[in-house]
């Protein structure tokens, strides 16, 4: 009686060892070659194998089939799937690219140099193309020079630009009509698609500069217009309070204000 019990247990143990019992797990980058997933109640014996195929975007790591083999300790996987690679991305003119990798699912970020703007998408992804080859999608963008429209017109003045568009870094020069003074920078710069602030043309006439107990030491003129400079000195016995020089400025005023001669 005791021997029969041992024999039964031994046979039962052999039966469990010979069976892996359930279907193996499926790696996320593979699929079963045959429809074993629907046979959830199937039992597999030691030595049985189940084949896998790589999902799109993946390839076999080495030659030969990919399969799991039932062993005494469970399923053992032979071979595996690894990500396919896209071709090396090409550089773009007047721009840079930040490569996050060249494997399936990786991305590239594009940016343009100063003075250029991106035409197209700023990111491309490594994907499986319609022909089965690995491609970057969407295609690489281009970096196009930022352009300014024709520079703005100003009252009582003009500029020397006659183009429809201007590239980044272009400079256009303004001048004023006769009798007007140019206030600001005569040249405007195209930068980032915008012009720097243009000057204005104004009539600037300052009154004759006179100070009590003092006199002009330089800058004698019958009339004074924008940016004319004058210098002052005091008579003997007086000393200068304030700046010794002044400039005719917008608003028909002297700046800094005229000095005084004090005892």
Swiss-Prot record:
Location in the cell: Virion membrane; Host cell membrane; Secreted
Domain Sushi: 20-83, 84-145, 146-203, 204-263
Disulphides: 21-70, 54-81, 86-126, 112-143, 148-190, 176-201, 206-248, 234-261
Main function: Serves to protect the virus against complement attack by inhibiting both classical and alternative pathways of complement activation. Binds C3b and C4b.
Principal subcellular localisation of the protein: virion
PANTHER family referenced in this protein's UniProt entry, alphabetically: PROTEIN CBR-CLEC-78
Keywords: Disulfide bond, Host cell membrane, Host membrane, Host-virus interaction, Inhibition of host complement factors by virus, Membrane, Repeat, Secreted, Signal, Sushi, Viral immunoevasion, Virion
BP-aspect Gene Ontology terms: negative regulation of complement activation; symbiont-mediated suppression of host complement activation
Self-association state and partner proteins as the record states: Heterodimer with A56 protein; disulfide-linked.
Organism, scientific name: Vaccinia virus (strain Copenhagen) (VACV)
Family: Belongs to the receptors of complement activation (RCA) family.
Record flagged with keyword Disulfide bond: yes
InterPro entries xref list: CCP_VACV_C3/B5, SEZ6_CSMD_C4BPB_Regulators, Sushi/SCR/CCP_sf, Sushi_SCR_CCP_dom
Single GO MF annotation: complement binding
An annotated GO cellular component: host cell plasma membrane
Record bears the keyword Secreted: yes
Entry-linked CDD domains: CCP
Topological relation to the membrane, as annotated: Peripheral membrane protein
Stated name of the protein: Complement control protein C3
Residues annotated as signal peptide: 1-19
